[in-house]
Structures are given as structure tokens and as C-alpha cells.
């Protein structure tokens, strides 16, 4: 049994698998575990007896302050050193200026895509930030980063005197008739329009590539963005392939 961890800025996903094909997963707020013992206290009731079967731990983390917690947790409770996802040449070539700057979650996504779906495609991951990644002939060619939905609505709320904090959901109208509708239209639909523009431009240059959609916020706009593949486990699959796959 393998324990796979995707440490994000807002939430962290913990998943167990035996074969890299079927996954059980749980989502925790990243801020709830500040020590290895706190992490154990949250995970033990969820994993139960499966904790005794863990023989390897793989981690993709974009929150450096949590890495020590994960390391100590792995050593104390499993006597295992975790394997950390990072950009390195192997099944994927990293054709960017500084591969070390590519987030571990994006590395995992790209590895999973190449292993499971092919060597050419566009990956959209919608979380705290929204990322776009391009893979051509098994080579990572770069991408784009946009603010995520909740980052945008909280920024408007904190950065202004009167704008409210609104629910994040799609707008089914052309223009908003009140402040809440204006924000929803700008944040959610505006993000979709931006992604459509980026995807469209990529396809103009690289051809009609398939799009895979993933990430905790992707369900909000799943029906608004044209895509060929929806895989909410893409990042976790990538952690498995990177750390324990062939």
C-alpha cells in the first residue's frame, strides 16, 4: 500500500492505493496540521488499519513550510523517507528555463498525463491558482498561471471597502444586475473566457490538442470549458507514477 500526498496552498489530498489504478482519498485543510502528531491524529481515523500496510510515501508539495511536517510524520510513524516529486528528465523532458521552478503539482500532472493519456495535450488544473500546462511529444513546453476563483473573490473583498464576499458559481447571464452578479460574472465566467483564449492560442500554434481538466475547483466550470478528459485524480496519479511507477 502506498500513501500519496498532494500538499496544496489551501487543501492537501491524502490518498492510498495498492496498484496506482484505484484510489481512496481524503482532503484536509493544509493549515490544520502544523506538527507530525497533528497530522497523524487527523489521518489515523481516516486510514484505520491501512496505515499498517503503508510501504512507501510519495509527496508533491507546493508549501515548503509543510515539508518538514511530512518528513517527520513519515519517519516517526512509518520509518520511511518520503519521495518528493520534482522536475527531472525521464518520461518527460522539461523544455523550460528553470525546471526546478515548476511546481510539484504541475510536475505530477504532466507525468500522469504522459503515462495515462499520451504525449500531446493541454492540462488545466483549477485550485488556489489555475494553471495551464502544455505537453508536446512528451516534452513539457511551459504554461500559464492565473488566480483561482477563491483568490479572486477574496482579493476583491479584502482590497475594497464595499465589495462583498460572494459565492463562487457560474453566471448564466450576459451582464450582472447587482454587485454579486457582477463579481460572479467577472470572476467565474471571466476566468473561463481567459482560459478559452489561452487554449485557443495554444491550439493555433500547436494544433488541436486534447484538453484534460482537473483540480478541486474544476467541477464549478466543468460544463463551461470544452475538454476531452476530466480526471480529478490526475495529480495523485502523477505522484504514484513519479514515485513508484515503472
From Swiss-Prot:
Question: Main localisation, per the record?
Answer: cytoplasm
- GO biological process, alphabetically ordered: coenzyme A biosynthetic process
Extract one GO cellular component term from the record: cytoplasm
* Cofactor: how bound: A monovalent cation. Ammonium or potassium.
Q: Name one Pfam family in it.
A: Pan_kinase
- Enumerate the active-site residues: 105 (proton acceptor)
User: Where located?
Assistant: Cytoplasm
Enzyme group, top EC level? transferase
Q: What is its EC number?
A: 2.7.1.33
Q: Which cofactor does it need?
A: NH4(+); K(+)
Q: Where does ATP bind?
A: 6-13, 128
**Keywords, sorted A to Z:** ATP-binding, Coenzyme A biosynthesis, Cytoplasm, Kinase, Metal-binding, Nucleotide-binding, Potassium, Transferase
Q: Which GO terms describe its molecular function?
A: ATP binding; metal ion binding; pantothenate kinase activity
Reaction catalysis annotation: (R)-pantothenate + ATP = (R)-4'-phosphopantothenate + ADP + H(+)
Which superkingdom?
Bacteria
Which positions are annotated as binding K(+)?
A: 125
Question: Which residues of the sequence carry a binding annotation for substrate?
Answer: 103-106, 179
Associated pathway: Cofactor biosynthesis; coenzyme A biosynthesis; CoA from (R)-pantothenate: step 1/5
What role is this protein assigned? Catalyzes the phosphorylation of pantothenate (Pan), the first step in CoA biosynthesis.
Cross-referenced PANTHER family, in alphabetical order?
TYPE III PANTOTHENATE KINASE
Q: Which family does it belong to?
A: Belongs to the type III pantothenate kinase family.
Subunit comment for this entry? Homodimer.
Descriptive protein name:
Type III pantothenate kinase
Q: Which organism is it from?
A: Thermotoga maritima (strain ATCC 43589 / DSM 3109 / JCM 10099 / NBRC 100826 / MSB8)
> Gene of origin?
coaX
Amino acid at each position: 500500500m502506498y500513501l500519496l500526498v498532494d500538499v496544496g496552498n489551501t487543501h492537501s489530498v491524502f490518498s492510498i492505493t495498492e496498484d496506482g489504478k484505484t484510489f481512496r482519498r481524503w482532503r484536509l485543510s493544509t493549515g490544520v496540521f502544523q506538527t507530525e502528531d497533528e497530522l497523524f491524529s487527523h489521518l489515523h481515523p481516516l486510514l484505520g488499519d491501512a496505515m499498517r500496510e503503508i510501504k512507501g510515501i510519495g509527496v508533491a508539495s507546493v508549501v515548503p513550510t509543510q515539508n518538514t511536517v511530512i518528513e517527520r510524520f513519515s519517519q516517526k510513524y512509518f520509518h520511511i523517507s518520503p519521495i518528493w516529486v520534482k522536475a527531472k528528465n525521464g518520461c518527460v523532458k522539461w523544455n523550460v528555463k528553470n525546471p526546478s521552478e515548476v511546481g510539484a503539482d504541475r510536475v505530477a500532472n504532466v507525468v500522469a498525463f504522459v503515462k495515462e493519456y499520451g504525449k500531446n495535450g493541454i492540462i488545466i488544473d483549477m485550485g488556489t491558482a489555475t494553471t495551464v500546462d502544455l505537453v508536446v511529444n512528451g516534452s513539457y513546453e511551459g504554461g500559464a498561471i492565473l488566480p483561482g476563483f477563491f483568490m479572486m473573490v477574496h482579493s476583491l473583498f479584502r482590497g475594497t471597502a464595499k465589495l462583498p464576499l460572494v459565492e463562487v458559481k457560474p453566471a448564466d447571464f450576459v451582464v450582472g444586475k447587482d454587485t454579486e452578479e457582477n463579481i460572479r460574472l467577472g470572476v467565474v465566467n471571466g476566468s473561463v473566457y481567459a482560459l478559452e483564449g489561452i487554449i485557443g492560442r495554444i491550439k493555433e500554434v500547436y494544433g488541436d490538442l486534447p484538453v484534460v481538466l482537473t483540480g478541486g475547483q474544476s467541477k464549478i466550470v466543468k460544463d463551461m470549458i470544452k475538454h476531452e478528459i476530466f480526471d480529478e485524480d490526475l495529480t495523485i496519479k502523477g505522484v504514484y507514477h513519479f514515485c513508484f511507477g515503472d
